[in-house]
């Protein structure tokens, strides 16, 4: 992984991905005790940053392999990103999704033209299912985070943050990233290392699923023992990736951990003050900025809202939580 791959991904994505801005609200600033800058990837195509990695991975593939079709496993956002990217490249797509994924994510993935295969998150391995179907059908597997071209695509978020930070005069700030397996976090970290080295990347995770935060403290990969138990489904993973982990270990600061209650409150704040729809996992970084303010340094903080694919009932719960 290197910055040249991320710059190449930016060229492929140009004209296809939404170039999201940095947004600010004085109301959020008051809660956080500093200026809060929000990178709203909930406004990205398919409702999350995952479109970037999916499209870049398909664009970079060998044309013959791409024509044979692709397969991915995902709780929903990578699923939708790959499904739309496959449709845009006129190829077939199979998505392996947990049966407890939000209904909206499952229905949207099907609407993009993908074949959806459901599995039991608590008792089955999506990796094993994906590898088996890939071999049986001759499909190319696009992993959700531990895939170089996927990381490169996600890293384009970091290039844009660096550009906008310069415009706004932000030279010293924590950049808090919603973190599951680390594809977005490591991609942003690589981009900022090259283009804005004074900005510090910090992962945000739900409590009891903070494998990256624990890994950073321990200096080695730590695993989560549970596979379910948080509303932040989009960022629940077993452990950091083999590719993403060494990047995060080298470039990331101390991890931040938030509760489900804080995630819902952040969803409500994003809607009230920025008119943004965030899903629970996508609001984790904002929750850390607002409710873990004593763990953050500097007069500015930049956060990703990484996704907005939330079921209406969950969103209503969030709005009622304040």
Description of each model-found segment:
Residues 1-322:
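PLP-dependent amino-acid enzyme catalytic core
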